[in-house]
UniProtKB/Swiss-Prot annotation:
The keyword Aminoacyl-tRNA synthetase does not apply. InterPro entries: G_OBG, GTP-bd, GTP-bd_Obg/CgtA, GTP-bd_prot_GTP1/OBG_C_sf, GTP1-OBG_CS, GTP1_OBG_dom, GTP1_OBG_dom_sf, OBG_GTPase. An essential GTPase which binds GTP, GDP and possibly (p)ppGpp with moderate affinity, with high nucleotide exchange rates and a fairly low GTP hydrolysis rate. Plays a role in control of the cell cycle, stress response, ribosome biogenesis and in those bacteria that undergo differentiation, in morphogenesis control. One of its GO terms (biological process) is ribosome biogenesis. GTP binds at residues 165-172, 190-194, 212-215, 282-285, 317-319. Its main location: cytoplasm. It is found in: Cytoplasm. Residues 356-434 form the OCT domain. One of its GO terms (cellular component) is cytoplasm. The gene is obg. This is GTPase Obg. Keywords: Cytoplasm, GTP-binding, Hydrolase, Magnesium, Metal-binding, Nucleotide-binding.
Amino acid sequence: MFLDTAKIKVKAGNGGDGMVAFRREKYVPNGGPWGGDGGRGGNVVFVVDEGLRTLMDFRYNRHFKADSGEKGMTKGMHGRGAEDLRVRVPQGTTVRDAETGKVLTDLIEHGQEFIVAHGGRGGRGNIRFATPKNPAPEISENGEPGQERELQLELKILADVGLVGFPSVGKSTLLSVITSAKPKIGAYHFTTIVPNLGMVRTQSGESFAVADLPGLIEGASQGVGLGTQFLRHIERTRVILHIIDMSASEGRDPYEDYLAINKELESYNLRLMERPQIIVANKMDMPESQENLEDFKKKLAENYDEFEELPAIFPISGLTKQGLATLLDATAELLDKTPEFLLYDESDMEEEAYYGFDEEEKAFEISRDDDATWVLSGEKLMKLFNMTNFDRDESVMKFARQLRGMGGDEALRARGAKDGDLVRIGKFEFEFVD
């Protein structure tokens, strides 16, 4: 089964908790704090593997969780950092944040790596909080929670040339005779239901990859037929071979076919029309094909401005192999002078997949539940909250000072909070003291 989209969840490892410990040894009076830091949580890393061809591995395994770091230890020893979880993906995988739709990365090179979820840093042990005023602190931090996100994966096959056209115009036959690929061929619509890939070698020794894509029909850009399921694969191609059945064996007008397919390409992604097209007039061994070709050329010229350059037209027969060598040489020549096309605008890409907080991000938000409990929320606040060790009084007091420094007490008071009101942060409830 060919699978080219998948939605998965990834969870990086939490940082290990810092430790509260004190040095207690004979002949070492006033040993002081000795608790070490927790280890870093493991990242979730995507690694490109050229041996993979589909996203099939993600059909049943949709959850990926990295290990957490070890806790800090006595003698000031740090906990061990967790190993990264490395997930193999095929070449041509685009990774999006499922919530925002932003493109995180486009993985196209073998061995390329990208961190899709960052592990949390280890919490600090009490040795880190020693000061002249507090030489024996009973303060430690919990490890930072690892990043958790839902991802949308899209596989767009890597090919230099894409074959497009209506069903049964001869795309699969053409691919089978110009490459060693063995696509499924039949005298019925949608014989090809997955993209097929083959390598072409011209008489002059040049080579390039060709993809035979499932046939398009009118409305494909809106999902009709196989629709957008396979239109995405055209995006990576640099040259489009537009295959047209000049025999009109299906009862359609070849020129109307040409217009209809271009309309679908344009509707799906305007940039597809920036790619150079070669018109391949196929089935020229059939009766009336030559007459239809002359009519096609006439209509094409009528709809082009006199200063516009007409697309190149190559009459061929996939069955008899007539005209194939000339077509392949011209395709190779066009590829040599055609650059790669950007798949995404910069606005579609995250500048950096970084797990952290924006300087201008609001520290917290205040709301009120139906039971009159004040609720404090916000990513920055929850990070501090989750890293607080509430088993230690000094850690609790430290969090209270941080919350006050962020303006929490003042903001609650401004919203009308009174002495004795309940305040909820996460699953914990506190009493507001004015």
